[in-house]
Amino acid sequence: MNPYQNKNEYEILDAKRNNCHMSNGYPRHPLANDPQMYLRNAHYKDWLSMCNKNNPVGLIPPESFEWTWLNGTVAALTIVSVIAGILVTAPVSVTAGLITVLGAGAALLAGITPLIWPATTDNTFNKITDATEVLLNKEISEFVRKTANTKIDSLQQLIYYYQNALENWKKNPNDSAARNTVSTRFQIVNAFFVEAMPALSMPGYEVVQLGAYAQAANLHLILLREGIAYADQWNLARDPMHAAGDLHYKEFLDYRNQYINHCSTWYNEGQNEANLKNNGLVYQRTMTLFVLDLIAMFSTYDPRLYTMPIKTEILTRTIYTDGVNRNEPKSIHNPGLFRRLEQMKLHIYEYQGAQFLSGHQNIFRSMNYNHPLIYGPVQGYSSSNINKITTINLGDYDKIYSINTESRNRLVQGSTTFDKINFYGAFNENWLFSVYNQNGPIIKHSNIPGIDAPSTGLNYSNYTHYLSNCIFQSNRNGGSAPDYNTQSYVFGWNHYTIDPTGNYVTDAFEVNKNLPESRYVPQISQVPAVKASDIFNPGRVVNAKVESGPYFTGGDVIVSKAQLDGSGLARTLITFPIIPKRYRASGFRVRMYYAANHTGQVSYGVANINTTGYANFQKTFDGWEYFRARHEHFKYIEFDTTFSLRNSGQLEEHLLHIYYPNTTKISGDQLLIIDKIEFIPVGIPLNQTSEGYNTYDQNTNSYNQNYNNYNQNMDTTYQPNYDNYKQNSSGMYDNPYNQNPKDSYNQNYTDTYDSGYNNSQNVGSNYNQEYNTYNQDTENMYNQSYNNYNSDNNNYNQNSDCMCSPGYNGNYECRCNQRANGNYPK
């Protein structure tokens, strides 16, 4: 029997198969199914030209809409989309077969400034502020508005002033006058940002100015990132006790904490007030787009942690459009593992010769496509008299970007019912649900940002969100049959940067197929924790589940809660279905972004492959409530093994194991918050330089952070001791380098990844990173000692109170010197 054959009682609307499969070993879910793929073959000038247009890379032009709130929404969507595109595809130029990867810092600032200050319309600060005034029904005073505008106008002039000097220096990199000019102008703009930020958060107007504040914070952090990247050439903060850029890197970390905590605090204040005023859903959606999506990107700006382009998957949150045929007064939170909406079943009830939509069922698939479908409950009216079910099949690939509904007011009992629902798909497909009744239709468009679609403004080629959830209600108005019910929907949407077909891990993206081996540019792959497929809690001691994330993570997180009672080994297991594709890398380093209120151990392994890595996590915050964790409490730990993943594109299961000996009863919940897993490729042979990434040599499984003369006598908190770190012991670290016990980090290694991170190219690849002048005179909150490191077993024993586990070679990335100076949470 043909399962797609139409029956009298069943109708199936099926998506056409996508025949655009890549011949790269992806049997079901091609890695090329990527909304940002069109940027990957763009050279820098072409890419910059796209970004400097009012309609960048096919996105929606802000000036094409009349409504104030819509202008602000579209502007915010455009900026986040451009940031995500730049991070994942860092623009490149190719000269004589040599690829130059242009650092994301420089590209970000060049790309978003024309979006912040477009040539033909008002600036984005004002658009977003105007929209927030409408949202909150609160007008900013004339004094506050003028003060803010004065600062914004000055910022615009100073940034252009700096960018002119930057372009001049790039044309004349050996000219000392050009170098001094750009360095001076950078520092002037940086100082003005510090002075201007309070004007965007005036007392009494913190929430209404919050969107503008977030945009300014974003610009400031991008500027600092750029200065850190060029610090060596510009001689920034250079003296015998500092490495170039160290002062600005510390400021970057401090200001990032300050900005994120400020935005989190005041978003929360506004959400609470909006819920009380029955405007919670609109506030949640609007301010997520204006503020939370943007600050979630800040974690990727760290130039010493992200030394190559990033395959970003951050915005896993779901936002909801306004209810159709009903008002949804409160914000909506439904924490759970990420799932793809694969089918919808619409139940039709016939009564007195008329047909009515009476029920709706969502059918999902987890990130493991080998698992069975997940059937949600039937929402609405359920009866044995249902005589037709329309099934909408999205298949493996298609996504719905807009929904148009037609409803009718019925004379009987004043109910409202759906006649037509048109679902528009990303592959230019559409599905029509229809029943026939009388009276004129009430037409509603549901999408992000909320316009008529499909149209030139929003269609299958330029959408930013796709349908992920349908909440259906059939509210009875007094009758006993479903025809007396008012039917309503609330639709949930995910951001297009989150791939609903799987977790793809790749070591590089292809720049130009016509080039030889040098055509690949390495990239870091992110896998959000909520894109796990399973959480297994075998006992009652440890319970891990998905919880609403803090406001800066871009979505929900997995929280493991252990109540240790001394009864013996306790554990939980989280399964990540990974689809790896290696082009050139010898393997991957793996790290985890987390926060915890205790110390403990985790392991990471690959099923059916005898490889397991271990890492100790440290206590990063106090208290027994996970939602009290602030941005500065989240740290990275790296597992102590390089993972040689398959290169076939076939799904494999990765296992994150949290375990406790549980030999002693401990009071209070032991909390571990997991936000994401990241994969860093190692051993990629390339012939390229990396402008803007020139501080580091990203080589094999050693994280080279340029701490040559890092002076920590400036209120920092991390004091590592490298002297007795046993690295090549019992084969645990069988890597092609050795640690010099006299504090000289000599990476004499045949460089398989000569990317110019240390501003030198193809020079024998001997990167001598001296720690001899590392000044450990500090307040020493975190005295990290490797003296007791026992490498005779696989138990990564880190005798430390530090928040960071530094992986293989000491401090691969310590963010413990971040300090909180915000007031979040309340």
From Swiss-Prot:
GO molecular function terms attached to this record: signaling receptor binding; toxin activity
Region feature Disordered, mapped onto this chain: 717-743
One Pfam family cited in the UniProt record for this chain: Endotoxin_M
Taxon lineage: Bacteria, Bacillati, Bacillota, Bacilli, Bacillales
CDD domains for the chain: delta_endotoxin_C
Described purpose of this protein according to its UniProt entry: Promotes colloidosmotic lysis by binding to the midgut epithelial cells of insects.
Record's compositionally biased regions (Polar residues): 720-743
One annotated GO biological process: sporulation resulting in formation of a cellular spore
Superkingdom of origin organism: Bacteria
InterPro entries: Galactose-bd-like_sf, Pest_crys, Pest_crys_dom-III, Pest_crys_dom_I, Pest_crys_N_sf, Pest_cryst_cen_dom_sf, Pest_cryst_dom_II
Similarity annotation: Belongs to the delta endotoxin family.
Protein name: Pesticidal crystal protein Cry27Aa
Miscellaneous comment text of the record: Toxic segment of the protein is located in the N-terminus.
Keywords carried by this UniProt record: Sporulation, Toxin, Virulence
